[in-house]
Design a protein with these regions (language model features):
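Substrate-binding pocket helix/loop in short-chain dehydrogenase/reductase
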Residues: 3-5, 100
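Active-site helix of classical SDR
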Residues: 19, 53
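Alpha-helical segment proximal to the catalytic Tyr-Lys
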Residues: 24-25, 66-70, 128
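Active-site loop immediately N-terminal to the catalytic Tyr-X3-Lys motif
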Residues: 29, 42-48, 70-71, 107, ...
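Residue(s) in the substrate-gating loop at a strand-loop-helix junction
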Residues: 37
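Short C-terminal tail/terminal secondary-structure segment
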Residues: 42, 120, 131-143
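A conserved structural motif in NAD(P)-dependent oxidoreductases
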Residues: 104-115
């Protein structure tokens, strides 16, 4: 129960209330980029609570985009695939790496810059006509 509540506190409550607080002070043309996960759209056994939090983010993105669109504020999310960081320590093991590579079309592990480049794009004026969307940045996993 504690882990479940902690996941929702970090992954849903925090971005929800942060965006709520920022809404009144955001300028026209601003952009919000939240973090989702491909896990929101896959049945991955023990990750059901985590997946539910990321599904909630995908829904919040749509609601926030609708609420802020009149003010010219865009809201999107990225859904990163497996990046070998402390958050996905399993990917640092041979079995975890084999699993991650096995589900990706591009057959390499993502690096933080792979994800950061998409976040930068979504936050930029180059993405001025994109809102309410979650962009998968996962190397083509589960194609």
């Amino acid at each position: 129960m504690e882990d479940f509540d902690a996941l929702f506190a970090v992954n849903v409550r925090t971005p929800f209330f942060l965006v709520q607080r920022l809404m009144p002070i955001m300028c026209r043309g601003s952009s919000i980029v939240l973090v989702s996960s491909p896990a929101a759209h896959a049945a991955l056994g023990t990750l059901s609570a985590y997946a539910a939090t990321k599904g909630a983010i995908d829904t919040l993105v749509k609601h926030f985009a609708a609420a802020l669109g009149e003010r010219g504020i865009r809201v999107n999310a990225v859904a990163p695939g497996v990046v070998p960081t402390d958050m996905s320590s399993f990917a640092k093991t041979a079995d975890g790496r084999d699993f991650a590579l096995g589900i990706q079309a591009l057959k390499r592990m993502a690096q933080p810059d792979d994800i950061g480049a998409v976040v930068a794009f979504l936050a930029s004026d180059d993405a001025r006509w994109i809102t309410g969307d979650t962009v998968r940045v996962d190397g083509g996993s589960k194609l």
